[in-house]
């Protein structure tokens, strides 16, 4: 009965999303007084960053962007990191824009391990649950963006359906200030370089979170899965950016946890986040970006820097016990170091784009501990990714190598997890793509009493994405 009720809830959620998406696609957001100017800037972005003209130009006219300083939810947002310091279109009063993203995967993965038996109530909890070929739960996001005043907008993202939650719930919501709403020359000159973000938002630690899959929004990830150590979370606080001539500096202070709390203040402290970088077009065909980020929390009851993805991983039930459930074991295949009490982390991310070739790297180290530990543990995390886009950027091939090495709580020797992901994709339109990957992941140096001892999973995952 419970499984039938769960199935009904999920089918209901997906049906609701499809109805909402259809309504939003036909909803008249505002008058088209600015359409000619908007179309021109949008066409340029599409030709440079996404699909080839003239078909891309026709698509751009049908999906005008009415929000300033905005990263598009479709393929125009590819290789965009921080929201651009560019109004994009003249302010013409209050504007509201809705969007959505939807994904569906088909998984064909096998797994194995060599752990010693751990029998409880006649069940070996170190054996692996049986898995086969089939569809995963559909994921969906709903976006609401509003231009409140000149240079001021608000963003709200909700998860309509995810692996970890079948019900609708809010991911984040924040205010972004890129200009002064008042006619003041001094403020106008200052805001040419500054950006403020306030609210409950996805923190800007590293650059991978701009390329990762965010539940239903999978258009910016060239592959299906995210990194092993998925540095992604939302926290409440504020950010200040300074940008000029390609240089970027960011400082942020947040509450240090995924949700606000006022109890037990002696066990909590703010998180401090910093970022420095450069992003420039060195030559007509060459773009270079290099950033370094740091994140620090001295004490917390439940810090989620590496456990903040409330959507779950894309690899269902891999290396899980027979009693695993889709929601409770939602992060199958991820490496979660267990730094809930304190954590200090840094990451360097290089990005190079030369014509159709994109290279992206992740060099990271994190140190911290849980509430029950007295000494810190260290994890090192590396990733290299290559993408080559061709046929007017509509087709691409991609590959990623990822390795994480460190000490888990209760396991004395260091362990290593490595993953390879070759794949590719096809942008049918700027809003619709299909992609596939082969994934192989190995677990090394885990004790024989751990279910991950000499564990391995490999296979293929196919994913379809709609985003607008």
Each model region followed by its residue ranges:
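A broad helix-preferring feature
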Residues: 20-28, 385
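Histidine- and aromatic-enriched segments that form or immediately flank copper-ligand environments
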Residues: 118
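Outer membrane beta-barrel
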Residues: 85-115, 124-259, 265-299, 382-398, ...
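A broad, low-specificity signal for short, low-complexity segments enriched in glycine/proline
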Residues: 56-63, 135, 198-202, 209-213, ...
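Outer-membrane beta-barrel pore domains
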Residues: 2, 36-40, 44-46, 59-64, ...
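Sec-dependent N-terminal signal peptides
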Residues: 10-21
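N-terminal periplasmic/intermembrane-space "pro-region" immediately following the signal or transit peptide
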Residues: 2-3, 7, 17, 27-105, ...
């Amino acid at each position: 009965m419970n499984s039938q009720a769960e199935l009904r809830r999920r089918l209901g959620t997906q049906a609701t999303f499809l109805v909402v998406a259809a309504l939003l696609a036909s909803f008249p957001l505002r008058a088209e007084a600015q359409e000619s100017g908007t179309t021109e800037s949008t066409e340029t972005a599409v030709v440079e960053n996404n699909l080839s003209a003239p078909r891309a130009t026709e698509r751009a006219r049908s999906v005008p962007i009415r929000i300033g300083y905005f990263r598009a939810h479709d393929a125009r947002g590819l290789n965009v990191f921080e929201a651009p310091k560019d109004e994009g279109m003249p302010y013409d009063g209050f504007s509201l824009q809705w969007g959505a993203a939807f994904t569906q995967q088909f998984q064909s993965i096998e797994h194995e391990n060599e752990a010693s038996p751990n029998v409880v109530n006649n069940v070996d909890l170190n054996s692996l649950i049986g898995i086969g070929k089939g569809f995963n739960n559909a994921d969906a996001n709903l976006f609401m963006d509003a231009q409140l005043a000149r240079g001021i907008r608000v963003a709200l993202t909700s998860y309509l359906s995810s692996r970890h939650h079948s019900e609708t719930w809010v991911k984040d919501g924040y205010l972004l200030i890129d200009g002064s709403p008042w006619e003041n020359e001094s403020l106008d000159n200052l805001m040419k370089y500054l950006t403020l973000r306030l609210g409950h938002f996805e923190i800007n630690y590293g650059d991978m979170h701009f390329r990762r899959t965010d539940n239903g929004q999978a258009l910016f990830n060239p592959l299906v899965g995210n990194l092993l150590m998925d540095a992604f979370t939302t926290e409440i606080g504020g950010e200040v950016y300074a940008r000029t001539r390609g240089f970027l500096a960011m400082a942020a202070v947040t509450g240090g946890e995924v949700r606000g709390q006022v109890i037990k203040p002696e066990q909590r402290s703010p998180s401090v986040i910093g970022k420095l970088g450069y992003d420039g077009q060195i030559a007509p065909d060459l773009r270079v970006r290099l950033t370094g980020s740091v994140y620090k929390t001295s004490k917390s009851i439940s810090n989620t820097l590496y456990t903040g993805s409330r959507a779950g991983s894309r690899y269902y039930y891999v290396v899980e016990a027979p009693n695993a459930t889709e929601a409770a074991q939602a992060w199958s295949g991820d490496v979660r170091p267990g730094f809930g009490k304190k954590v200090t982390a840094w990451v360097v991310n290089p990005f190079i784009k030369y014509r159709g070739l994109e290279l992206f790297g992740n060099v990271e180290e994190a140190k911290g501990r849980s509430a029950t530990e007295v000494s810190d543990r260290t994890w090192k995390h590396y990733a290299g990714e290559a993408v080559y886009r061709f046929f007017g950027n509509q087709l691409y091939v991609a590959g990623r190598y990822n390795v994480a090495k460190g000490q888990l709580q209760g396991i004395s020797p260091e362990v290593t997890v490595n993953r390879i992901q070759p794949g590719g994709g096809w942008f049918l339109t700027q809003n619709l793509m299909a992609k596939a990957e082969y994934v192989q992941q190995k677990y090394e140096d885990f004790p024989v009493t751990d279910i991950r001892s000499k564990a391995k999973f490999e296979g293929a995952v196919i994913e379809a994405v709609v985003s607008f």
